[in-house]
């Protein structure tokens, strides 16, 4: 759909369904959109926004999943002039009424991507065609030599996500093959009577966000721990041995891959050569685990405002202590942040990450105030992330300005870093770490992983028929707190970063039932 729009020099705008009805209404009104394309399951979400947004004349939906006729009827009732059709009907219409391409210019706006704003109102990040091309070039200069026409990329992240947008276009540039999956059907455990998306498609490249990789890791550990003592000892012994071999450069890891880790690799299709984490920080332990048990996991860093450019790891320069090289299409500098003691003159150099280059947005759509606050007159975008450079010139993120909270003892803690560590605990399905200036330590609000919670309840002789009942049990709450505190200590957190309390929620977090989101969700 986006390529069809580009062929006619049309600008697209993307918005997450998690922005809610108000966010959707804002993006439609601000862009004065004439058409909207969505999943059929979201047709009902359009009803209230379209009562006020009268510029929309076309509602298009894809053919993946069933739609409810009542939603279509309601939309027609709201606006009788609406044209509503599915993707196949649209394609058939195009085949019968072909038009010549109208290629865009590099300075034309390709996409307006809406992200959560600091005031609650979504911000539209305006990205030109030259920004997208420069981003693909930046990715290619680092990992292009490892990827070619024979590679397969499994795509399943929202297409409103800048990481997905860039990598899909990059895959086409490399001549690779894309397979579209769904986060809910990735693994065999998520489906019945068929293979999961990963094993069916057998990708060679898999890009994911921290929450996906934590789920993969926990799934592997769960299966290993469910095996016999011999299986458990063999797995953990092999993992330790491979770590030693890899760190010393000694041969022999291939034998362990063929004998011990083969079943795990087969569960991911058996063809994976590169895993990549993006969209947020991942626990070192998880990155190392995936790299040893499956295939090397590289890291990437970027923002919507920089068209996903920031840092990207070269697979042959693997490390779990930094994000990687600076892409060729941007430049980065570290700017002093005195409040927390970060200075470019520190050893190593530290400060707020500022990025400049062709991939960087020239401003937020119809939002001069946010643009002036975020972008300097000479084109530097202020990311709000605190970084440092290592001896190899690789970028490492150590904090985030907005997530730095000064506690009662006067010291700063970084909430995003804490969330990445505590998320690695088997008990955690989702998490938000909270701190305030009149308390000495943070607390955590979590959605527990149901199997792990029930297992912990049984170990502590806590009775409860449902997760709704278990999350309110005080004895179990104490046990969960100990699990999280142990994970924090194992992850290298300092004393002031160890949570002193936990609140459990039985419900999955959605825009409809909560008024906050964790920073790395």
Residue ranges and their predicted role:
Residues 133-152, 159-258, 271:
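Conserved AMP-binding/adenylation subdomain of ANL enzymes
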Residues 359-361, 394-423, 452-474, 495, ...:
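Adenylate-forming
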Residues 1-13, 17-21, 29-35, 151-152, ...:
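A short helix-loop-beta submotif of the ANL/AMP-binding
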Residues 83-85, 91-114, 121, 146-152:
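Conserved pre-ATP/AMP-binding loop-to-beta segment of ANL
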Residues 110-136:
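Conserved AMP-binding A3 loop
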């Amino acid at each position: 759909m986006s390529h069809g729009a580009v062929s006619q020099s049309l600008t697209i705008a993307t918005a997450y369904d998690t922005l809610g009805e108000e966010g959707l209404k804002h993006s439609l009104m601000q862009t004065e959109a004439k058409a909207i394309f969505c999943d059929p399951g979201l047709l009902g979400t359009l009803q209230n926004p379209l009562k006020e947004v009268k510029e929309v004349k076309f509602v298009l939906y894809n053919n993946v999943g069933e739609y409810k006729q009542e939603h279509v009827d309601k939309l027609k009732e709201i606006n009788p002039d609406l044209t509503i059709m599915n993707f196949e009907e649209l394609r058939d219409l195009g085949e019968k009424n072909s038009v010549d391409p109208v290629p865009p210019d590099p300075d034309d706006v390709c996409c307006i991507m809406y992200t959560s704003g600091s005031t609650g109102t979504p911000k539209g990040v305006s990205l030109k065609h030259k920004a997208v091309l420069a981003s693909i070039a930046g990715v290619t200069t680092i990992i292009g030599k490892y990827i070619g026409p024979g590679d397969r990329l499994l795509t399943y992240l929202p297409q409103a996500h800048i990481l997905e947008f860039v990598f899909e276009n990059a895959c086409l540039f490399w001549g690779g093959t894309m397979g579209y999956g769904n986060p809910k059907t990735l693994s065999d455990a998520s489906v019945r009577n068929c293979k999961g998306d990963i094993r069916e498609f057998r990708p060679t490249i898999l890009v994911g966000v921290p929450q996906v990789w934590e789920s993969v890791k926990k799934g592997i550990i769960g299966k290993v721990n469910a095996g016999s003592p011999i299986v458990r000892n063999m797995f953990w012994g092999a993992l330790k041995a491979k770590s030693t071999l890899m760190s010393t450069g000694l041969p022999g890891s291939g034998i362990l891959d063929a004998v011990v880790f083969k079943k795990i690799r087969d569960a991911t299709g058996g063809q994976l050569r590169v895993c990549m984490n993006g969209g947020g920080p991942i626990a070192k332990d998880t990155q190392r685990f995936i790299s040893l048990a499956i295939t090397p996991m590289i890291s990437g860093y970027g923002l919507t405002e920089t068209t996903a450019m920031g840092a990207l790891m070269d697979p042959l320069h693997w490390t779990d202590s930094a994000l990687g090289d600076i892409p060729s299409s941007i430049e980065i500098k570290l700017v002093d942040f005195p409040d927390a003691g970060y200075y470019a003159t520190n050893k190593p150099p530290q400060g707020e990450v500022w990025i400049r280059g062709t991939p960087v947005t020239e401003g937020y759509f119809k939002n001069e105030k946010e643009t002036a606050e975020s972008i300097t007159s000479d084109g530097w975008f202020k990311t709000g992330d605190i970084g440092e450079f290592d001896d190899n010139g690789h970028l490492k993120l150590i904090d985030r300005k907005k997530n730095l909270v000064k506690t009662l003892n006067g010291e700063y803690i970084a909430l995003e870093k804490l969330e990445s560590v505590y998320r690695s605990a088997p008990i955690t399905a989702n998490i938000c770490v909270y701190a305030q200036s009149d308390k000495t330590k943070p607390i955590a609000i979590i959605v527990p992983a149901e199997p792990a919670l029930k297992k912990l309840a049984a170990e502590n002789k806590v009775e409860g028929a449902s997760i709704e009942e278990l999350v309110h049990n005080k004895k179990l709450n104490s046990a969960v707190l100990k699990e999280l505190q142990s994970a924090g200590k194992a992850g290298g957190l300092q004393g002031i970063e160890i949570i002193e309390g936990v609140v459990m929620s039985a419900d999955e977090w959605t825009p409809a039932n909560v008024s906050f989101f964790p920073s790395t969700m």
